[in-house]
Curated annotation (Swiss-Prot):
Its cofactor is Zn(2+). It catalyses: an N-acyl-L-amino acid + H2O = an L-alpha-amino acid + a carboxylate; an N-acyl-aromatic L-alpha-amino acid + H2O = an aromatic L-alpha-amino acid + a carboxylate; N-(5Z,8Z,11Z,14Z)-eicosatetraenoyl-glycine + H2O = (5Z,8Z,11Z,14Z)-eicosatetraenoate + glycine; N-hexadecanoyl-L-phenylalanine + H2O = hexadecanoate + L-phenylalanine. This is N-fatty-acyl-amino acid synthase/hydrolase PM20D1. Keywords: Glycoprotein, Hydrolase, Lipid metabolism, Lyase, Metal-binding, Protease, Secreted, Signal, Zinc. Secreted enzyme that regulates the endogenous N-fatty acyl amino acid (NAAs) tissue and circulating levels by functioning as a bidirectional NAA synthase/hydrolase. It condenses free fatty acids and free amino acids to generate NAAs and bidirectionally catalyzes the reverse hydrolysis reaction. Some of these NAAs stimulate oxidative metabolism via mitochondrial uncoupling, increasing energy expenditure in a UPC1-independent manner. Thereby, this secreted protein may indirectly regulate whole body energy expenditure.
Length: 517
């Protein structure tokens, strides 16, 4: 008996020691990864220089007024067949007057594409260097004046801000690119590396007549791009919980899109003797099932994992330990991210019921009911998979489901120490924005014109070099869209320096202070 107890104690001690060793080993791994990830996943190849373009006072006034003039032109697009063609043509005339050096340069070719879009080919002095492209769009979403502090197309300047539709999406980029090029030309600067500038006129309605045709033209000419930079993410200040410093988030992919119509048809009748289920009730049940059963979390199957790991060193304890060890803590992080709509959108395909139409009179059983649901598809799945999940969730043959439009997510662009574009962005951001220490990859929630260019490059990046705070986000497509004059000056400075930085023909050796980023 005593011998048996002794053996049990030995076994218990051995198990306890084994568990202790496992816990210690796990703790060591967690701490080691937290230590290793203090340095960036991509080493800094450039020393921070701290200064870039020096614009004169008159140039700063000029760039501000050039943007204001463009914002005053109501280049609204409502649908692929309904947009303000008069304003689109006026925008073309406007940029010719605003940027005379660009339009008179002997090494810049300008073409009108799809009647209103613009393609500029800037011929560099070294034809051996692979070209790149800067992309933007002139069109804007509608802006009814109700609720605005200033008329949406007045470009009013108030307390250091320019108010107006397009100040953030996306005339700031369209005008900023041309402004930077104008300033470079005045300084007799000719780029070594060729590049293209594309300005679409129908991005807000999927770019079928603008960017799509520009991309097709480049492909027909055999053009291959080193990278393409379009609108998308930005420099986020105070938006990422737990991170105090501004973070430059560059989207390496964008979510897909699918819009479905749901229809239920039943015999109409009088409300005094209703059937057990009406068309409205059946459809309401189907829609409720979709809302109560969100798409599965795909955390870790898209760029969101890279985003967290690249930001790990910016978080305070204990978040830095958690973000450095997502191999262990990802289930917890995924659940936390699901709490808020803004972060939930990063980890799954989202479901949004946007339209519901039914009923003709208070005492009539309606013959039909219709709903529209919009899905933004995570990069870890395809539209076909989402449709199958929707059908299985609704599980009712009485509900007819029609696909209105479907776009798969774009491939994830390279983000590593061999990618030229990534290092050029890093260098330009760090020099232009001294308060930014982190340049990280991410996901663009919306859709951009860049999706049309996958046949000419696999390196597509989405970044609007402006500083955004939490209260700026609802202004995009919303009321009182605005940009600070200082932020726009920085955007032009970024683009000015980006063009110059792209003229290096190879990457330098890693900088000794790579741990700084």
């Amino acid at each position: 008996m005593a011998g048996g107890c002794g053996r049990r104690r030995v076994v218990v001690c051995a198990v306890a020691l084994g568990l202790s060793a496992a816990v210690l080993a796990l703790t060591a791994v967690v701490l080691l990864r937290a230590y290793v990830l203090r340095s960036p996943a991509i080493p800094r190849l450039w020393a921070r220089r701290g200064s870039t373009a020096a614009f004169s006072a008159s140039e700063r006034r000029e760039l501000k007024e050039a943007l204001r003039g463009a914002v005053r032109i109501p280049t609204v697009s409502l649908s692929s067949e309904d947009f303000n063609t008069t304003a689109m043509a006026e925008f073309g005339d406007y940029i010719r007057k605003a940027f005379p050096a660009v339009f008179s340069s002997k090494f810049i070719q300008h073409e009108i594409i799809g009647e209103y879009s613009h393609l500029f080919t800037v011929q560099g002095s070294d034809s051996e260097m692979m070209p790149y492209m800067l992309l933007a769009h002139m069109d804007v979403v509608p802006a009814p004046p109700e609720g605005w502090d200033f008329p949406p197309f007045s470009a009013a300047e108030h307390e250091g801000f320019i108010y107006g539709r397009g100040t953030l999406d996306n005339k700031n980029s369209a005008i900023g690119i041309l402004q930077a090029l104008e300033f470079l030309l005045r300084r007799n600067y000719r780029p070594r590396r060729s590049f293209y500038v594309g300005i679409g006129h129908d991005e807000e309605v999927f770019g079928q007549k603008g960017a799509l045709k520009i991309a097709a033209l480049l492909e027909s000419r055999g053009v291959k791009l080193s990278f393409l930079l379009d609108e998308g993410s930005a420099i986020l200040d105070g938006i990422i919980a737990g991170v105090k410093k501004p973070v430059a988030l560059i989207a390496v992919t964008e979510k897909g899109l699918m819009t479905l119509n749901f229809t239920v048809e039943k015999e109409p009748g009088h409300s005094s003797f209703p059937p057990k289920e009406t068309s409205i009730g059946i459809l309401a049940t189907a829609v409720s099932r979709l809302e109560q059963n969100p798409m599965r979390s795909l955390f870790g199957r898209g760029p969101e994992l890279m985003t967290m790991e690249h930001l790990a060193s910016e978080f305070n304890f204990p978040l830095n330990l958690i973000m450095s060890n997502l191999w262990l803590f990802s289930p917890i992080v995924s659940r936390v991210l699901a709490w808020k709509p803004s972060t939930n959108a990063l980890i799954r395909t989202t479901t949004a019921v946007t339209m519901f139409n039914a009923g003709i009179k208070f005492n009539v059983i309606p013959p039909s009911a219709r709903a529209t649901v919009n899905f933004r598809i995570h990069s870890g799945e395809k539209a076909k998979e989402v449709l199958e999940t929707v059908r299985n969730t609704v599980a009712d043959d009485r509900v007819k489901i029609d696909v209105i439009e479907a776009l798969d997510p774009l491939p994830i662009s390279p983000w590593d120490d061999q990618t030229f574009g990534v290092h050029v962005f890093q260098r330009t951001i760090l020099d232009t924005f001294p308060n930014v220490d982190s340049v990280v990859p991410g996901t663009c929630i919306g859709n951009t014109d860049s999706r049309h260019f996958t046949n000419v490059t696999n390196a597509i990046y989405r970044f609007n070099p402006v500083l955004l705070k939490s209260d700026d986000l609802p202004r995009i497509h919303g009321l009182n869209e605005r940009i600070s004059v200082e932020s726009y000056e920085k955007q032009v400075e970024f683009l000015f320096q980006l063009i110059k930085n792209c003229d290096v023909d190879k990457l330098p050796e890693p900088h000794a202070n790579s741990h700084e980023l």
